[in-house]
């Protein structure tokens, strides 16, 4: 068992932080900062990237940090590092690293750069139930979070679809939500490459046109009826809807739920299954409470809603340069 060399001599630390930054985040806001010193990596929330309209309590922000943490820990196994994780109630994450040859590499580390949010219409093919059950089992942990799957055509699939429609009605009637969303849309290649964050025209399936052409079109599309028509087509093309719930609803829980989410997304990626978020019912408080009643999960908190299925790969979201989201301290 050996401690790490100083980070200036150890490229593994850069590899670990890079893997962490490949995690998903709301509007691809990348709300994290990494401080690397000797044998530890500290992940802190960057509240300048918060989304107050859609995520006022920072619930999804901390889940994004959990996703980043999971990537880091999985990548560490590939490099034969043992990780010890410490969480504070404020959401500061410290990962202690020890080089150990007895660490078993996780196969999920290899698919971290392949994971993507696929917002396209899927091909309608169903995921075999035994396969999906095995994928859920592979992702599960003992933190109290649970994964529920609802097959297309089932009554609860329809219930959740309706909840998404209701979520769109609420969010698209909120000017603050729409303005926040617009502020994170990157309308063409030039715009996207100037920021390396946000929702690019490419991931939204739009052509690369001048901003003066695309921006008015996007603004005009931010209406509940148009969004519902688009989402309904995408949901109906999917195989299943997946709901992740937790026993508690605090910062530590959100981080751990993010870890489970990322692990499940990587398990799906490894199996060639696409995914995209349907988080509207989890983001609107009254709909979140309604989900608890409709699904008979009164003692659990809905955290993440996904649709999954089969689809062709799509464009990847940009990421900030590592130098912008990290600091490497010398010994």
Regions picked out by a protein language model, each given a short descriptive name:
Residues 1-331:
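Acidic, surface-exposed loops and disordered segments
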């Amino acid at each position: 068992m050996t401690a790490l060399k100083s980070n200036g001599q150890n490229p593994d630390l850069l590899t670990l932080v890079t893997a962490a930054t490949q995690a998903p985040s709301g509007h691809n806001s990348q709300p994290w900062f990494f401080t690397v010193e000797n044998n530890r990596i500290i992940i802190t929330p960057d509240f300048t990237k918060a989304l107050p309209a859609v995520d006022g309590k920072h619930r999804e922000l901390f889940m994004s940090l959990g996703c980043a943490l999971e990537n880091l820990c999985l990548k560490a196994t590939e490099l034969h590092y043992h990780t010890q994780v410490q969480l504070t109630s404020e959401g500061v994450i410290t990962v202690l690293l020890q080089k150990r040859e007895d660490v078993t590499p996780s196969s999920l580390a290899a698919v971290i750069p392949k994971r993507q949010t696929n917002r396209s219409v899927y091909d309608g093919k169903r995921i075999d139930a035994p396969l999906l059950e095995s994928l859920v089992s592979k992702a599960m942990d003992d933190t109290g979070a649970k994964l529920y799957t609802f097959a297309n055509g089932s009554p609860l699939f329809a219930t959740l679809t309706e909840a998404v429609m209701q979520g769109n009605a609420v969010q698209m009637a909120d000017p603050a939500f729409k303005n926040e969303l617009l502020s994170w849309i990157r309308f063409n290649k030039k715009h996207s490459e100037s920021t390396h964050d946000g929702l690019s025209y490419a991931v939204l399936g739009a052509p690369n046109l001048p901003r003066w052409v695309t921006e008015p079109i996007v603004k005009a599309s931010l209406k509940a009826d148009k969004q519902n028509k688009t989402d309904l087509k995408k949901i109906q093309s999917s195989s299943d809807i997946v709901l992740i719930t937790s026993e508690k609803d605090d910062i530590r829980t959100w981080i751990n739920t993010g870890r489970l989410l990322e692990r499940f997304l990587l398990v799906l990626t490894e199996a060639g299954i696409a995914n995209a978020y349907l988080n509207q019912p989890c983001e609107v408080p009254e709909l979140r409470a309604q989900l608890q009643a409709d699904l008979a999960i009164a003692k659990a908190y809905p955290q993440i809603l996904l649709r999954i299925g089969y689809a062709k790969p799509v464009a990847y979201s940009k990421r900030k340069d590592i130098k912008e989201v990290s600091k490497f301290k010398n010994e």
